[in-house]
Amino acid sequence: MKLQVLPLSQEAFSAYGDVIETQKRDFFHINNGLVERYHDLALVEILEQDRTLISINRAQPANLPLTIHELERHPLGTQAFIPMKGEVFVVVVALGDDKPDLSTLRAFITNGEQGVNYHRNVWHHPLFAWQRVTDFLTIDRGGSDNCDVESIPEQELCFA
């Protein structure tokens, strides 16, 4: 089955999470006007009194054509990925309770100036880089096991 890859926008992604970007976002000045603060761009949610982690994940580029065959979700916390050097990357997401609902399966490509924050329980493909090795600032939950993995029928990513 082929899965069309769409440009990432907050409107298209809102059911799955937040788009972390400055484009079309409000800001205010701090530090004597030297800094524009784009405040509260994503909801970080951590359950069970665990702690928030800030990490760097170095992702390897995927082999093309890319075929998706599994999704994961994190029921106890949100998970954010922000590329550190302006790299484009692709995310694959789906809604669903116990298993991914394939009717909601979507793929999005970023513009190089966007990160994503997955809502709790949103099914998504594990992180991968697109064209080159990419470092991602990652904000997620530390503590007990927080990852469910489900196999899905193979989906090949298609670009317009």
Curated annotation (Swiss-Prot):
HAMAP family: Ureidogly_lyase. One of its GO terms (molecular function) is ureidoglycolate hydrolase activity. It catalyses: (S)-ureidoglycolate = urea + glyoxylate. The keyword Lyase applies. This is Ureidoglycolate lyase. GO terms for biological process: allantoin catabolic process; purine nucleobase catabolic process. Catalyzes the catabolism of the allantoin degradation intermediate (S)-ureidoglycolate, generating urea and glyoxylate. Involved in the anaerobic utilization of allantoin as sole nitrogen source. Reinforces the induction of genes involved in the degradation of allantoin and glyoxylate by producing glyoxylate. Its cofactor is Ni(2+). Its EC number is 4.3.2.3. Homodimer. InterPro entries: RmlC_Cupin_sf (IPR011051), UAH_cupin (IPR047233), Ureidogly_lyase (IPR007247), Ureidogly_lyase_bac (IPR023525), Ureidoglycolate_lyase_dom_sf (IPR024060). Disulfide bonds: none annotated. Pathway: Nitrogen metabolism; (S)-allantoin degradation. It is an enzyme of class 4 (lyase). Keywords: Lyase, Purine metabolism. Gene3D superfamilies: Ureidoglycolate hydrolase (2.60.120.480). Belongs to the ureidoglycolate lyase family.
